Amino acid sequence: MSSGRALLHNPGDLQKTASTAGETRSSLARLPIPTRLKVFFVGDNRSTVNWGRGASLALGQLLSFSFEITGRVSGDFFVLATAEAGYVGTLVSPKYYSVFRHLLNRGRRLFAWYIKLEHFLGAKDFIAEDPAESIDNLLAHKHRHPALARIYNQAKEADLMVLDGDGDIIFSSPPRRQTLFLLAMIELGIRLKKPVFLVNSMISDCPLTGRNNRTLAAAKRLLAQCRTVSLRDPESLEYVQKEMPETNSSFIPDSLFAWFSLYENGNSRPPLNGDFLLPHPEKDEYWGKLDFSQPYICIGGGALAGSQPERAVEAYGRLVDAISSLGYRVYLTENDSSDSFLQRVAREKGLGVVPVTAPILMCGSVLAHARLFISGRYHPSIFASLGGTPCIFLASHAHKMGSLSRVLEYDLHRQFNAFPDASEIAEIVSTARQYLEQGETLRVRIRQVAKLRSYESAELPDFLKRHMNG
């Protein structure tokens, strides 16, 4: 691929709602207004063991420039295994719900009889397939569950609700609890007559199980009643415009792009000695493996790869061997807890690994200053792009990686297989070599696109205010 074909300068397939660079203030330069509307922020994923937590932090910062965040629901609520309140109608008092949640763990077969008894006596997850039923459950049980009462009260006291859709709205069978939780929160906002905004979202059918028409029907009903829905990628926008034409939808890039200014100069480089970024507990096998004084390539995981760790270890082992032939140091980046298979690859190949729990700004720094990043992870690929690092995209669930290549204006929108075989690995190496040969010319172009996306993402607060009155 020639340098002139590496990126498209003026793609016609992105519908932009934000202002141009010259019309937009830096996100960090925004000043709070004297009286600010109160926001209930649903989907704050900062506590999630995933590098995508940076996007939630960036979104919270964007909202805080213009609004007062008076309530939050963390991403922990989306999953039963971590939710502060999930099952209702249990024999166990809500005061001891953490004990019940502990017993729910599928690995605790000794207590399976007790969970079956609870089900028989009427215990259930308050999140149902029908969002209306979910909120009926919340209202019926909030007097016994302080966590549910807190959700209701925070929503009631807010002036508007902002939901971070992230990559959680996929119409799979069975339905994802994350999807159902978000739809339930929209239902709650509508019942309370609050302006509801779904932002930062991907929306798609499930490529593995096909479309869940029941969940799609619920989403169509609820999203049409949101003030507006902002999608983070063009394919999600096209999907909503086709399947939910009554929904007021727009494209606004992911909030993580708003962190561009943090990585646009040399002060953002990782420490030359990578031991300085190791998180607690500083495991012995991590020490002495990361040297950022020399050019390096990073390889990350992916949701699809993480779902089949044995297969992933084999495929990534071959990929590492092939990429090492390019003459650069190779480091693995554990971008999510399900990327733990990379720890085994690192041990077998003697490679350094950046742990999932490393400080998030340092995680971004490692990727932003790599020579190349190969991954099936959405937000880590954005981190890389903030510094101009070219990306090679591996497949993941739904369309997110291929669509990200459109957001970043790549000419090549290809997603390679999550478990690349020998022929695909050869193509990956060939593409990598072409990107590396283009050097700083390509990196400048990528940074220019990321900078434009940062201006657009920083317009989100003004976008919300414009739609407050319908």
PLM regions and their residue ranges:
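Active-site anion-handling motifs in enzyme catalytic cores
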Residues: 2-470
